[in-house]
C-alpha cells in the first residue's frame, strides 16, 4: 500500500515473473503469457500502521467503535438479493473456522428470530454434509482472509452440489471472494494482529444485518449498529485504557 494500490490476484495455476523490465503473468503448465487483471484496493497506508498504539491488537480493539457502525453501510442491494433467496428457499448453511465459526453460531440465533432455521458447521467437519446441499441452499462461508483452506474446501463442495455460495469476507480479492456467487465485504480494513477483533465484530454485524433484512427490520438493525458505535465511543478511550492498566498492575 505504501508503493501502490494496484494489484493482480493470482488464480490457481498462475505464476508471476518479476524482472527489471517489468512484471509478466504466465500459465504454470503451458508457460503461455497471460494478461494481468489489475484491481485497485481502497486501503490506506495508515490502515496497516500502528498509528501511535504500542501494538496492532490494541489499535484494532479501539477501531471497533468505527468499524461496527460502518457495517451498516454495507451494499444494500446485495443484502436484498441474498435475503430474497433465503426467504424463498428457507435453507441456510453456514461454515467457518476458528473465531469466524462463532459468527456462524451466533447468526443461527439471528436467523431464528427472523423465522429461518439455519445450520452452522466448523468447515473442517462439513464435507460429510455437503451432499445435502442443492440449488435451494444458500451457503454462507465466513472468513476474515478469504483464504482459510478448510472453508474453501467446504465452499467448493457446496457449490459443486448446486448451492448458492455467499462469502462474508474482509480481505479484498481473496480466493473465497472469487469463488462465491455473491460477496458481502465487511470493510473492517487490514487486521494484522493474530487475535481477531474488529473483523470478527464486523462479520457478526454483517450477518446481523442480513438476518434483519430477511425479517424485514433492516432499518432497526442499522440503527442498533450506529447506536452501538456511539456507545463504544464512550468506552474505548484513553480513560478506559488507564483504568485497565491500573487494574492489570494491581493484579500482577
Language model feature labels by segment:
Residues 1-86, 100, 109, 113-115, ...:
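N-terminal segments that mediate ammonia production and transfer
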